[in-house]
């Protein structure tokens, strides 16, 4: 009975956090009312701020609330909300949550690697809509927290997806292993790319489960993988989607979740709530996400279903629908510029029990 109430309380807390936080115009009429709104928002999101920061945070909150209010009064296909990012500046948001400079990491890494092929090149027909969540190939939305590990979350989500598709087994995998251990070309909480992460998983014989190597958002980069037993999920390699081509990207997403990089640094993206995102964003790729489907609204607006790693309270339960099929080849927010996916051709079970190496045992 005690366990039941603990589970119930946890569920209700999550439900409350994921619900929208609404306000009306009367709460914006005076500074006193906005202060009360800010206090209500802090309670809703369990936000604690140091006393010396109170004025600064309130002013930032007021600015963001007014932006949300003005934007939502316009006739746009998406809405904003005062989510948990509402009292941080645009610069702070970019630094903490959209600061993985893909161009910088690409320059350090050099030319793209992989198999050199695109297995979906000859696909001629795809379904009008696909949602890998409905097919059971997507785990629950996760939260990278204050760590620039989006690349690890994007990589893991794509691997979880293809593993489910090939083996009919959905296993939540370890982002923390990538943060701690994939350090030759990626930089933990300082950012990275999905491609070398796919290579790491292949070359190291797979990746641990989240259960055995849980996420803690730390960036000490002390690799514990060799001292942990349990299941390991493997892949065969990875491929790239031809860049700047949404039609080719569509072929890939029709067959599996695909890792992509986007420009997620705009104020509207920071405060996104629901709808098809057509807001301002460039092609300065700074955030790794994964496309888990696509579709079209009743009024004919095409979109990608994109899974983020900022927790379920952001956006549409942790997801954003981004406009698809625009005139620019790069796609909205550069979504077609850096797309890749893991390959796994075998339909045999992909998990195996790993053992602690003898040399590691000796050290324990």
Curated annotation (Swiss-Prot):
Query: Active site: which residues?
Result: 150, 287, 308
Q: According to the UniProt record, where is the region Disordered?
A: 343-364
The entry lists its GO molecular-function terms as:
cysteine-type peptidase activity
Which domain of life does this protein belong to? Eukaryota
Q: Where is the signal peptide?
A: 1-20
Provide the tissue specificity. Answer: Expressed in roots, stems, flowers, buds, green siliques, trichomes and near the stomata of cotyledons but not of true leaves. Found at the hypocotyl-root transition zone, in the vascular tissue, along primary and lateral roots, but not in root tips. Never found in the abscission zone of flower organs.
One record GO biological process: response to nutrient levels
Q: Which residues are glycosylated?
A: 122
Q: Which UniProt keywords apply?
A: Disulfide bond, Endoplasmic reticulum, Glycoprotein, Hydrolase, Protease, Signal, Thiol protease, Zymogen
Q: Where in the cell is it found?
A: Endoplasmic reticulum
Enzyme Commission number(s) of this protein: 3.4.22.-
**Which Pfam family is an annotated match for this chain, by its short name?**
Peptidase_C1
> Basic and acidic residues bias located where?
354-364
Q: Where is this motif: Prevents secretion from ER?
A: 361-364
Give the Polar residues compositional bias ranges. 343-353
Which residues make up the pro-peptide? 21-125
GO terms for cellular component: endoplasmic reticulum
Q: What is this protein called?
A: KDEL-tailed cysteine endopeptidase CEP3
What is the species of this protein?
Arabidopsis thaliana
């Amino acid at each position: 009975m005690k366990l039941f109430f603990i589970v119930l309380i946890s569920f209700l807390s999550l439900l409350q956090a994921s619900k929208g936080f609404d306000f009306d115009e009367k709460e914006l009429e005076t500074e006193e009312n906005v202060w009360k709104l800010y206090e209500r928002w802090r309670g809703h999101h369990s936000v604690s701020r140091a006393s010396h920061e109170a004025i600064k945070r309130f002013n930032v909150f007021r600015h963001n609330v007014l932006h949300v209010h003005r934007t939502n009064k316009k006739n746009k296909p998406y809405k904003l909300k005062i989510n948990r990012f509402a009292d941080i500046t645009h610069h702070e948001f970019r630094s903490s949550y959209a600061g993985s400079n893909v161009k910088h990491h690409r320059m350090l890494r050099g030319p793209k690697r992989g198999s050199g092929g695109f297995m979906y090149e000859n696909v001629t027909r795809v379904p009008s809509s696909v949602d890998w969540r409905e097919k059971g190939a997507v785990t629950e939305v996760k939260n990278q927290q204050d760590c620039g590990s989006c690349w690890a979350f994007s990589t893991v989500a794509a691997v979880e997806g293809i593993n489910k598709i090939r083996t009919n087994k959905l296993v939540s995998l370890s982002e923390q292993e990538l943060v701690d251990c994939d350090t030759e070309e990626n930089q933990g909480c300082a950012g990275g790319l999905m491609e070398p992460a796919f290579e790491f998983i292949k070359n190291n014989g797979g990746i641990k489960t989240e259960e055995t190597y849980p996420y803690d958002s730390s960036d000490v980069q002390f690799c514990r993988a060799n001292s942990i037993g349990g299941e390991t999920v493997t892949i065969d390699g990875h491929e790239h989607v031809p860049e700047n081509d949404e039609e080719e990207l569509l072929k890939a997403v029709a067959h599996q979740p695909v890792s992509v990089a986007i420009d997620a640094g705009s104020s509207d993206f920071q405060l996104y709530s629901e709808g098809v995102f057509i807001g301002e964003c460039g092609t300065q790729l700074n955030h790794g996400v994964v496309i888990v489907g696509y579709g079209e609204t009743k009024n004919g607006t095409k979109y990608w279903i994109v899974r983020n790693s900022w927790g379920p309270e952001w956006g549409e339960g942790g997801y954003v629908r981004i406009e698809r099929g625009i005139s620019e080849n790069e796609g909205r927010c550069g979504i077609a510029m850096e797309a890749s996916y893991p390959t796994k051709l075998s339909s045999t079970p992909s998990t195996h029990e790993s053992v602690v190496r003898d040399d590691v045992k000796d050290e324990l």
